[in-house]
Regions:
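Structural/interface elements that position substrates and couple domains in central-metabolism enzymes
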Residues: 1-121
Length: 121
């Protein structure tokens, strides 16, 4: 896929510990973000339940999927908005890691945790 740690842009979709909540206590997304950033990976967050100001106040780099691009998306939370999200307009998106196994097959390679990789053929 030609991704380099020094230039890849990763977006974590959802920071809550479970879907449709704003509770981030013990959220695996927080740990994952810290690991990625320690490795030098440019990491952003998109969570429709929080405002950009709230995300910045919590120390996150907000991402707006309507007008920004990224290389990798990691689904960290199963907010209902993510289940029907249209990823097709994100032209630079290389693949999605679906940590909650909520996405249907798409034209973008999707892999879920504990499942075989899948993509529309």
């Amino acid at each position: 896929m030609g991704l380099k740690v020094t230039t890849v842009k990763v977006v974590l979709f959802g920071i809550a510990y479970k879907g449709n909540t704003r509770d981030i206590r013990n959220s695996p997304a927080l740990t994952f973000r810290n690991i990625l950033e320690r490795k030098g990976i440019d990491t952003y967050v998109y969570d429709p339940l929080f405002t950009t100001t709230e995300l910045k106040t919590m120390g996150f780099k907000p991402f707006n999927p309507n007008n920004e691009q990224c290389d990798v998306i990691v689904i960290c939370c199963d907010h209902h908005q993510f289940k029907s999200f249209d990823f097709k307009h994100m032209k630079s998106l290389k693949f999605i890691i679906d940590g909650k196994n909520i996405l249907p097959k798409q034209n973008i390679p999707v892999t879920g945790v504990g499942k075989n990789p899948s993509c529309k053929e």
